[in-house]
Amino acid sequence: LMLDADRAVWAHIGDSRLYHFQDGKLVFQTKDHSVSQIAVMLGEIPLSQIRFHKDRSLLFRALGQSGETPAPQIDEQTLENGLHAFLLCTDGFWEYVLEEEMEQDLQAAHSAKQWLSSMRQRLQARAPRGNDNNSAIVIWEKIEKRED
């Protein structure tokens, strides 16, 4: 993730995700490079079922694959005035914290640390013991562009 005065640019690969929130609302999330994401895109399953799909861990693009290094997907968004929050997390995190809960916790938080702590509490209450695949980092950025 790279932020400058009026845009965010990121690269992503596999099933770790980047979520972008503006003023407490989810405005973008990366699409996984997984068999279950293809099933969502083809209309075979709803997005709400991706967490439970039998093929959710089958990736067609990931770091560490044998052979040629796959190219990451690169995206960017223009940043409007407001508070922008970014959550970068592994599948072991987003599988246990719903997007609606991410929004709720963000809207109630007074800091990035508090937001991450609230989501981590949800994860710890739901994840099986020994789940160690749950890395996450959050970034808050307030954008205030001068009007011409």
Regions found by a protein language model. Give the residues of each.
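C-terminal catalytic subdomain
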Residues: R61-C89, F93-D148
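Conserved, helical-rich catalytic subdomain that frames metal- and/or nucleotide-binding sites
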Residues: K31-H84
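ATP/adenylate-binding site constellation spanning eukaryotic-like Ser/Thr protein kinases
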Residues: I13-D15, D23, R56, T90, ...
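Conserved catalytic micro-motifs used in adenylation/nucleotidyl-transfer and phosphoryl/amide-
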Residues: L1-Q22, F28
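A short, polar/proline- and glycine-enriched secondary-structure boundary/capping micro-motif
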Residues: H20-K25, I38-M41, E99
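Short, acidic Gly/Pro/Ser/Thr-rich loop/turn segments
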Residues: A8, R17-L18, S36, E95, ...
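A generic hydrophobic-helix recognition signal that picks specific residues
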Residues: R7-A8, S36, H84, R126
